[in-house]
Amino acid sequence: MANAPHGGVLKDLLVRDAALHDSLLEEARSLNDIFLTERQLCDLELILNGGFSPLEGFMDEQDYTSVVETLRLAPFNGHKYGHVFPIPITLDVSQEDINTLGLKQGARVALRDPRDDAALAILTVSDIYRPNKATEAEKVMGADDIAHPSVAYLRNNVKEFYVGGKVQAIQAPTHFDYVPLRYTPAELRAHFHKLAWRKVVAFQTRNPMHRAHRELTVRAARQRRANVLIHPVVGLTKPGDVDHYTRVRAYQALMPSYPEGMAHLALLPLAMRMAGPREAVWHAVIRKNFGATHFIVGRDHAGPGKNSQGKDFYGPYDAQELVTQFKDELQIEMVPFQAMTYLPGSDEYQPVDEVPKGTPTADISGTELRKRLRTGASIPDWFSYTGVVKVLRESYPPRPQQGFTILLTGLHNSGKDTIARALQVTLQQQGSRSVSLLLGEELRSDLDPQIGRAITPEQKHINLERIGFVAAELTKAGAAVIAAPTAPYERSRQAFKKQVVGSGGGNYFLVHVATPLEWCEKVDRRGLYKAARAGEIKNLTGVDDVYEAPENADLVCDLRIDTVPEIVHSIIMILESQNLV
């Protein structure tokens, strides 16, 4: 039979509150609303379906403080200790939210999905408290270092107050992707019962799986006469990870490689914190709630990589040690992850610590795999499966098929528009991909017709962010994007780059058209500079608004010195050096 839930009872609030659904939905219409962030949405889903049992809501100050300091919920019903729970699950709000929504002890507020405005639950406020973010970072993540993605999120995104309180469920968040693979804990437990699975080894992953992972999980199952639950995270993972759509297709391609009836794939809508040892204990609690009896804990489990000093945030086996420390209370058996390596001589995988000294081995690192995908180089069958590689190649085409964005920045009349048009023609002549031209003045009127020539600095920043969004989407689709706004501020250019690199695939190049103001004014046949100096136009860059010259442009050019064909040729050479054309 499946493992008992953490705390003894599965807190399936969706089932518990089903009889109240209509009345709760009607009440929600009259309440103030909190629209959840993506992390809060993931957290709420696992609160509602029992994945976070024994939680029944967002932590109050007593539970929060206890979790941060002791990895346990606050003691209850006369017990000396509370249940093990290593990660604080909190709902953050601002002072403005508190004032606007009338948040206070006993108040009720609707929690809504920002994607469709659906009311998911009603929270009854038990308390409002100000967390010590430095302490939370030090205790939970191990360091107050913004190189850690969760510390950066805590410092930059989390608001100044937390609201604690139990929730009543109205409905779970709606998903339209991979619906047959999404199970609540109760549903997955019922599935195990139907299949008569008594022992289940759960495998946590946020990366694509290859032959080594398959061999590891099969080995773990056979040693324990158990079945395998492949339970990948499809909520929030580490920034830069492979998107979950690609990963799930890769998992589906992998599943037929398992012996018939051995393994099952289910998706977990978890927002990871990358908290290493604490995260491993948390993952064990969650898998216990989903019915698993065993849980694989890897080397540097859920580690975020390097800190600001270039060292790992956690030791390689800290996670395994912390799970072992709580093993009696967790009541889920840890399976230590031993890295697997390929032995060409015997055509098999073995744990690295079992390979005789001097035996030839072969491995492909994540960096090498990405390089092979980028260049189109072969990926050997001993490393992965044909179906998995096919999925990855479709999502990560080689460089000549990838999109890219070139941002030309400079003063009005610096020549950037002329260069952009000439570059567009050159790339279209090559015919390898679609080419999109985003000129600043044209895009400004298209994206916001109410904005005229005399726009404020903040409007300029917002306008470039909008152009960045368009550029990122086009780049992601494989287009060549040439953007030529003035882009006068460094922070705006960095925001633009972040959008393209984060969403568009990372192929971004900055060209500074450094033609000086005197020359730009001299050739200004439209009289914009003259009008600005006469006070007829406000905030014209270079006259009464600053232009911050970029310091690290990929190319700097000046139309007084360089011809347009020479500049275009230089840009093409940059693209060729990156194997993009």
From Swiss-Prot:
It is found in: Cytoplasm. It comes from the Eukaryota. 3'-phosphoadenylyl sulfate binds at E441, E442, L443, R444, T486, A487, R526. Its main location: cytoplasm. The record marks H210, H213 as: Transition state stabilizer. SUPFAM superfamilies: Nucleotidylyl transferase (SSF52374), P-loop containing nucleoside triphosphate hydrolases (SSF52540), PUA domain-like (SSF88697). One of its GO terms (molecular function) is sulfate adenylyltransferase (ATP) activity. Residues 1-176 are annotated as: N-terminal. Gene3D superfamilies: HUPs, P-loop containing nucleotide triphosphate hydrolases, Sulfate adenylyltransferase. Homohexamer. Dimer of trimers. PANTHER family: SULFATE ADENYLYLTRANSFERASE. This is Sulfate adenylyltransferase. It comes from Cryptococcus neoformans var. grubii serotype A (strain H99 / ATCC 208821 / CBS 10515 / FGSC 9487) (Filobasidiella neoformans var. grubii).
